Structure formats: structure tokens, C-alpha cells
Amino acid sequence: MTELIDIPFLLTKDCSADLEDRLRFCIETGSLYQTHESFKKDIGEIVNTRQALVNLKFGDSKLLTKYYGYLECLLKKIDPEALAFSWSYTNYTIFEGNVFRDENLLGERRNILFNLGIAYYQSAKHIDDYKNNLPLVCDYLKRSAGCFEILSQRTKERNSEKAIISETMLKALKSMCMGLAQETVWFKSLAAKKDLLTSKLAYKCFEYFQESLNSFQLVGQSTEYIKLILVFVESKMLYFKAVCVYRLAQSIESIADNVGVVIRCLSIAVAALTNSKLESTVVFKNKCLEMLRQLEKDNDFIYLKHVPSHLQFSDFVKLYKLDSMKDLIVLPDLTEIAPSMLDQILFRNLLPIEIMDYGTSYNEKQDIYVLQHFVEPINLLNIQLDEELASFFEIDPQHIVNAHNKTKSFVTRKELDVIGQSFGDLESNAINIETQLANITSYLDLEIKTYEEDKQQYGDVWTIVDARDVTKEFYEKVEKLRQYLEIGRNINLETQELFASIDKSLVTSRTSKAHLTAQYNDPFLNKIEALKKRRERFISEIEKKSYENRIISKLIMYYKETDDIPGTISEREEIFDNIYSKHMKVFAVDMKYIEDCKNENYGLIKEIEEYKSRTNFNNEDRSSDPRTQYIQDVRQSLASLDDVKTQLKKGTAYYQQLIEKVNELVQVIVGFLEARRNDRERLLNEISTAA
């Protein structure tokens, strides 16, 4: 299609060396237990393909399509800001200073899709036998328009993809390509020799080119290329304006009765063709001019009809319904534009660190769920029972105080000793964690020192990623864990101070718990004691169940199964949420136990109320009663002791989680150091062989 104007590609620089280094760094620092050596082939493939795109030509649409697919793979695995690519926009807009600008991974994808649109356009332009290849020409132009349409939508919808090439420019190019595609449909209709149909198809071409011209005029004549394209689009619009009215004139059956209308149509056609700069308009203009002059002469001497000079082009469009033609050009979607873009999946087995981040986030969410739906409700139910039992004891103080005012509680000196030892156990855990974190720091320091010594010895040939860069994230995690450790120690100190403030003589007895139970042998108290033990066992079991049922394996499985689906990990957050919702159904059966506990509490409280009624307890003020005051002191001490127990339990769980996180970090760093050691040995062998 030789009449098409040349539209240039966006220019880019060769960045293969920098791209390879950045990809290695991204894999080392942003993936899970993996090194760049495992993806050496994939890195080479994407670097070589990118290098081949520096000098583009019209037949490179397949190469662009392949590279576009590679970028889709990268966007699912790597932070878009981690990579940089140099691009020049001087053909489309005017810049001050440096011709080339850096773009991130999203900008790279955007520009590759833009160049793909240009490549399809250029493919249509270079088809010599236009008449016999109309479907192929039309397909290329639709694909080109489809690329610009996708870019236009992304530029409009995504603030993160603010493009140098504006949405208006993209709309202008899209409308131009659609007009050219419509032209192939119009051209094919000429063989049918149906002038009115041909006129309507020509008007559709006119509409597309008019839309394109309006958009280009909004862009402005910023560069020489834009000026040339603007002239081309305007000339095409004028050409099809002329074709439209010319074919309309041809469709009028009775020339003698409508010679004035025909003359007006030809006048509009000649005026439009006079301003068109297309070479093909010369012959057509002369033909229209010759017909116009002959009809004007015949009208002056034979027909003597009025020429409606007041009628404009838009009037003919309305009178003859030239705009009634539906859109015949349907743009393809991206999979049709670039059908082979996912033929080869790069970095298929690369697991982004974000997967682990999501897993950790969901684990924390799951822990909160277990705490809020199981642990806390049961604790609240137990507190409710304790409060009711307190009033139960006030009715009959002998349940707590004997004749000699000695405490008969269910806490022994041995139990208090165990509590005291627990503080030491927690501090031992803290010391162990502190030691592990110090060891991790030492390993990282040693790795940096080793790298610096190797770099100093071997110079530029030492191409292993800088240890100072790849260990930065590990140092940050160690510091975060130290902060968590300090928080735990502060809470332990506060709890220890609370324990020290408790009057041990009020909450301990000279006899064992078993002896007290035998002495009172209160079935009601025994019943409640057994119930609390069952609830404690349930909490232990539900916490164990939660620990053994983590979501990370399900996320990894889903990710591997759907690795060929386009899009970033963050775009799958809704799917991850659905996986989490299904995962949490494992606790659905346990919710019935909470309802059973609520019903148990209701029954026990009812029993206590009935007991109160039977005792005819006098509700007069007894605050001055020494026994009542003593009971209140006991209750306060016991409540403080319960707080200590609760905090110790939480502290144990807190340190357990902290130990798990430290162990996870140790595993990651061990894998990291192992990979670094392998890379070092490999590079030393290469240097030795080269020498």
C-alpha cells in the first residue's frame, strides 16, 4: 500500500549489559531461596531479544510480540521500578536537554506495544500487491489500531503509566489506522458497482480520518513527523469527502431532473480535492472537474435547473443518510494482536518474594482470627464464670476463708515457684534469639568482607552481585526482629513487676490443691474446674491446628499452576483472598464448640443464681465486714495472678512466633550464603581456566 505515509518507530538504546546485571540482582534479592544461576538461559534470551530491537524494521512484529510476552513474564515476577530502559521520543514530541529518557518496566512494555502498532502499520505499507491482498492489509491495520487502543486505555486508566505520548496522540493514530482499514472495505466495494453503498462506505472513511485529524490538531505540530502525518490525514479526509459526494452524484438516476444537485455534489468534490495533497487525487480531480464543466454547460443551455449552492456536505449526509452505515472495523483484543506472546514462559519457576509476603500476611490474619474467634471468647467466658463464682463465695465465705482466716484457694506454693521459673525461661528464649541474630549479623558481615577482598583482588572480572546491595534487606529484617525482641522483654519486665506486687500469703495454701479439693469436695467447683481444663485443651488444640494449617503452600501451588496468566501478583490479590477464605473453612467445624461453651456458661450461671435464692443471702452493706474485705483482697490478688498467667502464656506464644521468624530468616540466609558460595566457586574456576 505505497500511498501510506512513513511513521517512525520510537528509538531505544542497547542496554543489554545493564539489563543482565539488573536482572541478576532482582532475582538474588527479590525471589524466594533462588539465585540467578538457575535462570541463566532465561536472562540470556530476554537480553538478546531486547538487543535485537535496537534497530527495528517493518518485518519485526514477531520479534516485538515475543519480547512483549517476555515483559509480561517479568512484570509478574519483578518490581517495575527495578529495571530501567532508555527511549527517545524526539519523533513525536520536543524535549529540552537529553534526547533519551529512562523508563521503568511498565514504560518499556508501553513503548514496545507502541512500536508493535507501528510495525503492523509498516507491514501494511510494504505490501506491494494491494488490490489482491486487501484482507491482509486490513488485518495489519486493525492490529495496529488495536495496539494504540490498548495503550490509550492504559494511559487513561493507570496513573502509574503516565506516558510521554499522550492519550490524544494514541487516539489520533488509532483513528487513522481504522480509516485506512475501512478504506480496504471501500475499495473492495467498487467491484459491486453500487454507488450509494460505495458513497456510504466512503463517508465512514471520512469520519475516521476526521476524528484522527481533530486529535492530531489537539496534539499540535510539535515535530516535523507530526506535521507530515497531519497533512496526510487531512488529505485522506478531503479525498474521501470528495469520493462520498462523487459516488452520491453517480447514484442519482435522473440526471435531467436533478442536474442541479449533481453539479453541487461535484463542486464540493472538486473543492475538497483541490486542498488534498495526495498524488492519487490529481486524476480523480481532473475527472470530476471535466464532468462538472460539462454538466454546467448542459444546464446552461439544456436543463436550465437551479443549482442549490446553499447545500453543504453535511446537508447531503443528512438528506441521503450517508452516516447510517454501521462500524465494520472491529478491533482485535491483545491476544489476537499478539497471539504468540505467551508461547514461551520465561522465569516459570521463579517464585517472587511477594508470595512469601502474602503468606506471612495471611498467617498473621489467621492468628488474629484464632485469637478473636476462639481464644478470647473462651477467656471471656471463663472470666464471666469467675465473676459469678466471686459472688458465690461471698454468700458463703467459708469457701475461701476458714475459721483461722487462712487462705484456702486453689493455688499452691509450688505453682507460684513454677510461675517464677517461667520468667527465667522467657529470658532464656530472649537470650537465644539475641545470640542467633548476632550470629546472622556476623555471617552477613563476613560475606561482605569476603566480597570486598575478592573484588579488590580480581577487579572488574569479579562479576558477582555486590554483597552490600543484596544483604541490605537481611540487615533490615534482623533489626526489625531485634525491635520485636525488645518489645517482648519490656512486656516480660512489666509482668514480672506485677507478679512481685502480689501478696503470696493470700493466694497460697499450706496444703495441696488435691487436699483442698478433697476437703471441700464441692461437686460444683469440681465441675467448673474440669470445664476450664477442657477449654484449655481446646485452645491448645486449635492453636496447634492453626500452626499446622498454613496457607503458603496453597499460594505457591496456585501460583505455579497459573504462571502463564498475564498480570502482576498484586493484581491477583482478590484471588488470593478467595484462596484464604476457602482455607479458613478448616476452622468452621470448631465454631460449634464456642457455641457449646456459651450454652454451658448460661447453664452454670443459672445454677449459681438458683444457689443464691436458696441461701436467702442478706444483701445489706457488708463492706465493713473484715471477712468481706479479706475476700476482696484475695479476689484482687487472684485476679492479678490470673493476669500474670495470661501474660506469661502470651509471652510464651510471642517468643515462639519470634523464634519461628528467626529460624525462617536463618534458613533463607543459609540458602543465600550457599548460593553465593557456589557462585564464588564457579567464578573462581572460570578465572582460573581463563588464566
Curated annotation (Swiss-Prot):
- Recorded coiled-coil stretches: none
- Superkingdom, natural source: Eukaryota
One annotated Gene Ontology cellular component of this protein = endosome
> Where in this chain does the record put each BRO1 domain?
3-385
Q: Which residues cross the membrane?
A: none
The UniProt similarity line reads:
Belongs to the palA/RIM20 family.
**Per its database record, what is this protein's job?**
Required for the proteolytic cleavage of the transcription factor RIM101 in response to alkaline ambient pH. May act as a scaffold protein that recruits the calpain-like protease RIM13 via VPS32 to its substrate RIM101.
Protein name (record): pH-response regulator protein palA/RIM20
